[in-house]
């Protein structure tokens, strides 16, 4: 039996430790991780919801003036960028090695970012969805699917690499307007905190990148969009219906002249597909309205050869170009980088694709 005074002393010491832990809960102390210094913090939102978890990685000898913010796509977290599912170095290490400070975020209501029950609704992806769209596309659900060769392993349930990838899938906020709006605000708050940066988005997060640039044009040095949510306006396989009334976003983005209330003044026209392996595009009628704030921000849209985005990725680049954005379209297949799917930054040649992005950033 612990003596009474010893028990009291133990409780007091524990209380002090708990208070110290509570006071440092929202931001960790920096710690040496060998080649870089790391920390984490929360930013944006309110006390109960819509803050984002952020990890900061700083090289021991930074050589680049602007950091890179990485925002993962649907069902993913910042861990996407750390290593590949089969254990190879990820893009975070690559850009750290090239002197960039790196910020990895978890979207609002995602992963380590808080979610207040009752706001929107949460969903998760089953194994068949992950196989069909990302890892094992040996089918004909889109014309380029059979070209997919770069996923490590079989891409099927039971394969160690697939199982590691699927274990990293998390629930996501399925109310897309809530997700886009909250992530735009939280990542804008991150820019307010850290200053000018490049914003790198993947998939679902693509529309956030456009809106973050629209909200903070003086702080976004460039936008790298890896197969961003698209194409403009209307969904394509595996989704259907009207999704982005503002062209490249769900929520309001600034045009000049104005797009009107709820984008009702955006007139569109259908442009025929460039060939049988691609879809038609919805662009603006001439003369187009210009994306007022995005015009000042250079953008890179990256499309993979075998992805389900492959039939329509060029439409997003064409829409941005028509609206006055300084955009470059990196069609990986046409550049000789073959066999990639939607999760290109995790695949066997992930660092070859990282070189494409690095080259573009260094030109800005």
UniProtKB/Swiss-Prot annotation:
Glycans are attached at residues 49, 262. GO terms for biological process: lipid catabolic process. Its main location: secreted. Its EC number is 3.1.1.1. CDD domains: Esterase_713_like-2. Keywords: Glycoprotein, Hydrolase, Lipid degradation, Lipid metabolism, Secreted, Serine esterase, Signal. GO terms for molecular function: carboxylic ester hydrolase activity. This is Probable secreted lipase phiG. It comes from Fungal sp. (strain ATCC 74256). The lineage of its organism: Eukaryota, Fungi. The gene is phiG.
């Amino acid at each position: 039996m612990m003596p009474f005074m010893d028990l009291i002393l133990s409780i007091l010491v524990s209380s002090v430790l708990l208070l110290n832990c509570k006071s440092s809960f929202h931001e960790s102390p920096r710690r040496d991780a060998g080649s870089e210094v790391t920390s984490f913090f929360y930013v944006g939102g309110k006390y109960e919801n819509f803050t984002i978890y952020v990890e900061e990685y700083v090289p021991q000898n930074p050589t680049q003036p602007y950091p890179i913010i990485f925002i993962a796509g649907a069902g993913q977290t910042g861990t996407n960028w750390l290593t590949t599912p089969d254990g190879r170095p990820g893009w975070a290490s690559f850009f750290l090695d090239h002197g960039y400070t790196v910020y990895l975020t978890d979207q609002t209501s995602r992963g380590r970012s808080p979610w207040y029950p009752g706001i929107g609704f949460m969903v998760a992806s089953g194994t068949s969805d992950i196989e069909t769209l990302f890892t094992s596309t040996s089918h004909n659900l889109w014309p380029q699917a059979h070209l997919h060769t770069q996923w490590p392993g079989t891409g099927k349930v039971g394969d160690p690499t697939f199982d590691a990838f699927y274990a990293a899938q998390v629930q996501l906020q399925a109310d897309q307007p809530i997700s886009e709006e909250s992530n735009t605000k939280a990542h804008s708050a991150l820019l307010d905190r850290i200053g000018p940066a490049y914003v790198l988005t993947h998939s679902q997060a693509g529309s956030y990148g456009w809106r973050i640039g629209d909200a903070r044009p003086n702080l976004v040095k460039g936008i790298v969009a890896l197969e961003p949510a698209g194409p403009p306006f209307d969904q394509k396989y595996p989704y259907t219906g009207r999704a982005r009334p503002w062209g490249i976003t769900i929520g309001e983005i600034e045009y000049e002249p104005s797009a009107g209330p709820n984008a009702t003044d955006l007139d569109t026209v259908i442009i025929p597909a460039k060939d049988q392996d691609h879809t038609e595009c919805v662009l603006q009628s001439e003369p187009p309205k210009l994306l007022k704030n995005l015009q000042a921000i250079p953008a890179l849209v990256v499309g993979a050869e075998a992805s389900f985005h492959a039939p329509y990725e060029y439409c997003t680049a064409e829409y941005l170009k028509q609206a006055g954005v300084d955009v470059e379209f990196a069609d990986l297949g046409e550049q000789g980088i073959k066999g990639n799917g939607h999760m290109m930054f995790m695949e066997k040649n992930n660092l070859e694709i990282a070189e494409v992005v690095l080259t573009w950033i260094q030109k800005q």
